[in-house]
Amino acid sequence: VFPDKAAVVDQNRTVTFRQLKAEALHIASYIAGHFSRCHAPICFYLDKSAYCISVIMGIAYSGNFYTPIDTKMPAARIEKILETLENPLMITDKKHLPQVQKFMGDSDVLCLEDALDEPYNEQVIMDIKDRMIDTDVLYVLFTSGSTGNPKGVIIGHRSVIDYIEWVTETFHFNENTVLGNQAPFYFDNSILDIYTMLKTGATMYIIPQIYFAFPIKLLEYMETNLINTIFWV
């Protein structure tokens, strides 16, 4: 509906809805063409940026479900998550590839830069879409784990659809909404930001983490960028 409107803004680039979808379809085509996975876990290990949203959408378009991995997460926790997910595919970029290879071993690792260069395979993606149903898993987020072991919470497409329908109707979010994202993508508060943006055509600003240490600078950033909606803890 708003192809040339800003969808996601981070400190390095502004991505329109058209660009976001195009990047996601390239990523989905790469996953489908090189790994032949469906209804399978795919993790991503990336710095927080607009590329994370492209990856999230690309994984969903490929018929799989995603788990964000924080680049600051201890190796022991990452290993437990990977063990729980039972050999997931991992998406990372060239910057983080050496780190990822240390804990992934011989498991499948997809480089984001390669995926973005992959031609969009419309037929393959449409075939995947035709086989998907609303109860398919969309993501698995891991809690801190009170026992020391991270526990995965499984959420399906229908749950997110119903939640975002309720959120947008209750709070009257629309294309004029400007979201200020604070929550990490591995935390469920980010679901409101991401999927409100995708449903309504709102713009989501990924606020640089440094601003949260300086309240006045944070308020100036929000005022400059006309941010009118926040969901923070």
Where are these regions (language model features)?
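Carrier-protein-dependent adenylate-forming modules in NRPS/ANL systems
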Residues: 1-161, 171-172, 201
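Short hydrophobic "strand-cap" motifs at the C-terminus of beta-strands
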Residues: 11, 140, 182-183, 207, ...
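Conserved AMP-binding
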Residues: 46-49, 70, 183-190, 210
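Short, surface-exposed, polar/charged, turn-prone segments marking secondary-structure boundaries
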Residues: 71, 88, 117-119, 207-209, ...
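A conserved hydrophobic position in a structured secondary element of the catalytic/binding core
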Residues: 92, 111, 155, 182, ...
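Conserved AMP-binding/adenylation subdomain of ANL enzymes
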Residues: 151-180, 188-229
